[in-house]
Amino acid sequence: MLFGKHPFTVVPNGIDTARFAARDPQRRALLRGELGVTDQEILFGHVGRFSDQKNHPGLLKIFAAVRTRLSKARLVLLGGGDPAYVEKMQALAAELGLGDSVIFAGVRSNIQSFYDAMDAFLQPSLFEGLPVVLVEAQTAGLPCFVAETVDRGAAFTDRVKFLPLNDTAAWANTIAAASFRRDPQAREKAIKAGYDIHTSA
């Protein structure tokens, strides 16, 4: 064991739960309008640096399969990275026939506003520890569809579905059958799980 017989304390990565749980219909409508997303469309989101670990190729293939079942689905990708890699993902999106259904939003400082604008969160990472973005998305009350490679200890709401990394059909079928209702008690659950920065630090 890392610490042997010595006592230790695990301190979760805390976030400002009030900030991420705040709902603002006007802010949601404004941001969706800026993105060109209508009220009738389902906006999926992903937050993460463009890198091999985050598995953007797999994410785009999953979303392409989702689009065959949910024609009004849109996807917003938040994060930076190597411009050449981003361009490669843009080319893949075009190759998959996704057109303007995928929004490459780049690096943003108002991430909490984007969680408010989303209807669901996707994270098909090749490997992860305990991703803070998943804590943020859950605190926002979002349904989260996550690869089985992610630590199950990261889930503290019943809105998290763990799915096999390489089974695109399983992802698409599960997502298409899902209810996109937010969890109204998400912040309380985040605090209870120890993720509030004011109590975990």
Walk through the language-model features, giving the residues of each.
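Carbohydrate-associated surface elements
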Residues: G14
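A short helix/loop element that forms part of the nucleotide-sugar donor recognition site in Leloir-type
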Residues: A21-V37, A91
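A conserved mid-protein helix/loop that constitutes part of the nucleotide-sugar donor-binding site
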Residues: I42, H46-A65, L75, A84-K88
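Nucleotide-activated donor-binding/catalytic signature segment of Leloir-type glycosyltransferases, i.e.
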Residues: E87-G106
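Aromatic "clamp/platform" in nucleotide-sugar-dependent glycosyltransferases that forms part
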Residues: V107, L126
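Short hydrophobic beta-strand element within catalytic cores of glycosyltransferases
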Residues: L134, T139, P143-A147, R152
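A charged, aromatic-enriched C-terminal amphipathic alpha-helix characteristic of glycosyltransferases
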Residues: R182-A201
